[in-house]
Amino acid sequence: MKKSGLLNPDLCYAIARLGHTDTWAVADCGLPIPEHVEIIDLALVFGIPTFEQVLNALKPEVVVEGAVIAEGAPERIREMVDTDVEVVTHEELKAQLAECAFVIRTGETTAYANVIFKSGVAF
């Protein structure tokens, strides 16, 4: 058993496969995800886990060099993202999901609580 950090094996594996500039997303429970994109579904019930809980667990695990957020995203979601942010329409964000390596589905019910992250390098 792992001693600390992420415990979900699918999530650990997906993060380990990321390369520089690969994209991945953290999404609310209502975002339509393209069929060909891997979904790591963490949602249990509405509101659990929250976007913030998932993002806080991920921050120590991944290097991020950029993010994409939809115009309608709440300010509190934007404030959680500790990197340069590109703001696009919600339709453009949904289109960019097709290029993501995976999407982490949370139980978040806040509208537009979706962020696409661009992987950086640790060196």
UniProtKB/Swiss-Prot annotation:
GO BP, sorted A to Z: D-ribose catabolic process
Keyword terms, alphabetized: Carbohydrate metabolism, Cytoplasm, Isomerase
UniProt pathway annotation: Carbohydrate metabolism; D-ribose degradation; D-ribose 5-phosphate from beta-D-ribopyranose: step 1/2
GO CC, alphabetical: cytosol
Alphabetized SUPFAM superfamilies for the sequence: RbsD-like
Location relative to the cell: Cytoplasm
Entry EC number(s): 5.4.99.62
Catalytic machinery residues: H20 (proton donor)
Pfam families assigned: RbsD_FucU
KW Coiled coil (keyword) present: no
Gene Ontology molecular function: D-ribose pyranase activity; intramolecular lyase activity; monosaccharide binding
Binding positions for substrate per the UniProt entry: D28, H90, Y112, A113, N114
Enzyme class, spelled out: isomerase
UniProt cross-references to PANTHER family, sorted A to Z: D-RIBOSE PYRANASE (PTHR37831:SF1)
Protein purpose: Catalyzes the interconversion of beta-pyran and beta-furan forms of D-ribose.
Recorded family membership: Belongs to the RbsD / FucU family. RbsD subfamily.
Subunit and partners: Homodecamer.
Entry protein name: D-ribose pyranase
